[in-house]
């Protein structure tokens, strides 16, 4: 329906573009309310890979700024072993291009597909970034995000945390 009625470029000033902009703004506002984000905090991308690339690049640029300022930064980029393959690929790519010199480390999961919190407790103090899924799109396993957050808080980790929440949205 949207492509029939609102096919215009939402960045243009003509009538079809203005209709597309209104539709896009309405969807963005509904998404913002659904996830509890502030105004101007929802970005639409073309898909999972672009969203992951954007989040990883943003976080690793911030890590590099911390390094340049002489701040203590963890040496690990931790990602759930069942993450979308774009996650470790993006981490490796931007780590190399930005020259952050960090080590990638897969966080194992247990027999039910849940992140091994015992391993995360050991690694969290060394983390510069942690990447996890809220819900696995292949197995349906739901991550215990509150427990992961508790590990991060107890470890006093300043690591950036990216959560792929697409599969959990609205549940």
Regions found by a protein language model. Give the residues of each.
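Pyridoxal 5′-phosphate
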Residues: 1-171
């Amino acid at each position: 329906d949207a492509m029939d009625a609102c096919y215009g470029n939402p960045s243009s000033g003509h009538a079809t573009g203005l209709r597309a902009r209104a539709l896009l703004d309405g969807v963005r506002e509904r998404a913002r309310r659904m996830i509890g984000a502030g105004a101007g905090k929802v970005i639409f991308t073309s898909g999972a890979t672009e969203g992951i690339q954007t989040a990883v690049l943003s976080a690793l640029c911030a890590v590099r700024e911390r390094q340049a300022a002489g701040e203590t930064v963890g040496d690990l980029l931790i990602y759930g072993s069942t993450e979308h393959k774009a996650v470790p690929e993006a981490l490796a790519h931007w780590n190399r291009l930005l020259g952050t010199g960090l080590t990638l480390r897969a966080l194992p999961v247990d027999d039910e597909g849940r992140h091994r919190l015992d391993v995360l407790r050991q690694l969290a103090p060394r983390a510069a970034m942690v990447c996890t899924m809220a819900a696995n799109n292949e197995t349906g396993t739901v991550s215990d995000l509150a427990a992961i957050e508790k590990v991060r808080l107890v470890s006093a980790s300043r690591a950036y945390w990216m959560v792929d929440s697409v599969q959990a949205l609205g549940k």
